[in-house]
Amino acid sequence: MKDCRQFYIDGKWVAPAAASDFSVTNPATEETIATISLGGIADVNKAVAAAKRAFPSFSETGLEDRVALLRKIIEVYQSRIEEMAETISWEMGAPMSLTRAAQAPVGLAHLNEAVRILSYFKFEEMHGSTMMRKEPVGVCGFITPWNWPMNQIVCKVAPAIATGCTVILKPSELAPLSAYLFAQILDEAGVPAGVFNMVNGDGPTVGAAIASHPDIDMVSFTGSARAGVAVAQAAAPTVKRVTQELGGKSANIILDDADLEKAVKQGVQSCFRNTGQSCDAPTRMLVPKAKMPAAIVAARQAAEATKAGNPLAEATHIGPLAGKAQFAKVERLINKGLEEGATLVAGGLGKPDGVTKGYFVQPTVFADVRNDMTIAREEIFGPVLCMIPYDDEEHAIAIANDTPYGLSGYVTSGDVDHARRVAKRIRAGNVHINGARSAFDGCFGGYKQSGNGREWGEAGLEEFLELKAIFGYEPPKKS
């Protein structure tokens, strides 16, 4: 069992101000694998003070120095990437096949993207007689979730370092071990003292202290809409910048001209990826009403072919849910779907056959779902798919947009131009055409209650900059 009780503050591993142990559980075995400390306000204050001290000098570092630092972080991260993949699998249950292919490498992708952007990005530009200057926003507080730990940590930390900001990170207490390893990577890479600080803790204590702290200039939060509202309320009195990536209930429109069987099976696999614990999962599958019987057959086949089991086994497609509370929530919502009259196509209540230990649920598909049902409105965050029939294309677009969320959308068509036309009408921050994956040089973020601001790529880097106008330069001479 690992002892990870220390916090990383001001370039050193330090003991918490007060002892408060918390057990980290492997959700596949329900066994304790590590102990961390839950921090308090004193720990946050110490970390913020370190970040505030470091900001004046780090914000003035040259572009070449920041690029060199990022390259060193990349080098160290690469040397420990297998350890990162194993750590993520232990702490949140994702299969090793997924942590090796995506969960661990995504951190490298964001670091490399930051270096790429800095190769051309202009921090100063002349607009007539005015110098438009982009400066680091300041001390940043990051509150990150457990479902894609390195994605959500590094897509914040990489642009913060790239722009000259300093950081206080509170990772999820359910999956803190990858963050602990990441702090070790930054330390080994030589990140200056105070530039990156990490304090473990829960949301109501450490998260709230970060959101409300008067010396933090920006808060970036990823998590539930409920928690996002609390973060925004805590941040409001200090009028700091707040960016949020919250929940989703993304629609997957399978158009009438799509290859139905291929589109349905691809949609099921995408919904179940990471055990359905992705905020942009395509959890509402919209199918032409006349084709629904065939779609149900394809969805049942895809669900029954999805193996939930030991994350270390090569044959495993999905692992457990991340914890006991998440297991209870998903089971409650599956039961709600049954109570409200949806037709169970595959899966259902209880653990998969032969599974006695771990927070595993059955890959579940519902048909005959109405868009006003609870399972079509609430973010379930588990491997649960809702199949919803539509009459025509206008009806499909209306259903897709009839949600309080707006993170992602999916459109499948045999005609890519047709898919693109429909994609432009989806009220969401990201739309995937014909199974296209997200690209790191794009951006990620949502409309409506899915949040505000953007992460990834150049748009994500811009979030960490203040725009200053300096008047009084010599106007350009006319030729």
Where are the predicted features?
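Long amphipathic alpha-helix in the N-terminal Rossmann-like dinucleotide-binding domain
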Residues: 49, 71-82, 96-121
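ALDH superfamily catalytic-core signature
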Residues: 226-370, 433, 478-479
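A short acidic/small-residue loop/turn micro-motif
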Residues: 15-16, 21-22, 38-42, 258
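Residue-level signal for inorganic ion chemistry
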Residues: 30, 66, 88, 111, ...
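Short, well-ordered beta-strand elements within core beta-sheets of diverse protein domains
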Residues: 32-39, 54-60, 107, 142, ...
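Hydrophobic face of amphipathic alpha-helices that form TPR/SEL1-like repeat modules
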Residues: 1-28, 114
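Rossmann-like NAD(P) dinucleotide-binding subdomain of oxidoreductase/dehydrogenase enzymes
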Residues: 122-262, 390
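Conserved C-terminal structural/oligomerization subdomain of aldehyde/semialdehyde dehydrogenase
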Residues: 29-35, 216, 253, 307, ...
